[in-house]
Amino acid sequence: MTKSELIERLCAEQTHLSAKEVEDAVKDILEHMASTLESGDRIEIRGFGSFSLHYREPRVGRNPKTGDKVELEGKYVPHFKPGKELRERVNLGS
């Protein structure tokens, strides 16, 4: 599901809200989540999961085109850990 598909679905379910209000709410939520992670904090949504940053150590990679070794710097990457309820729902649906 894309962001625009999410907005469309929410608009269909929340008929008392305008499309602009729904779009603004979704954008605000995503912006707050991004800025929270940017500041190094963790996000926990009970029953859904948590978002945090994981550090990837520096390593030697390879250029897939040439095969040359490339030094890759360490970096932080967003990580999502699903909550118990979400894991159970996904497993029941498969």
Swiss-Prot record:
Pfam families in UniProt: Bac_DNA_binding (PF00216)
One Gene Ontology CC term in the entry: chromosome
Keyword DNA-binding (UniProt): yes
Domain of life: Bacteria
SUPFAM superfamilies to which the protein is assigned, alphabetical: IHF-like DNA-binding proteins
The keyword Chaperone appears for this protein: no
Keywords: DNA recombination, DNA-binding, Transcription, Transcription regulation, Translation regulation
Gene Ontology terms for molecular function: DNA binding; structural constituent of chromatin
Signal peptide: none
InterPro entries: Hist_DNA-bd, Histone-like_DNA-bd_CS, IHF-like_DNA-bd_dom_sf, IHF_beta
BP-aspect Gene Ontology terms: DNA recombination; positive regulation of bioluminescence; regulation of DNA-templated transcription; regulation of translation
PANTHER family in the record: DNA-BINDING PROTEIN HU (PTHR33175), INTEGRATION HOST FACTOR SUBUNIT BETA (PTHR33175:SF5)
NCBIfam families (alphabetical): hip, PRK00199.1
Quaternary structure annotation from Swiss-Prot or TrEMBL: Heterodimer of an alpha and a beta chain.
Biological role stated in the UniProt entry: This protein is one of the two subunits of integration host factor, a specific DNA-binding protein that functions in genetic recombination as well as in transcriptional and translational control.
Family the UniProt entry places it in: Belongs to the bacterial histone-like protein family.
Identification of the protein by name: Integration host factor subunit beta
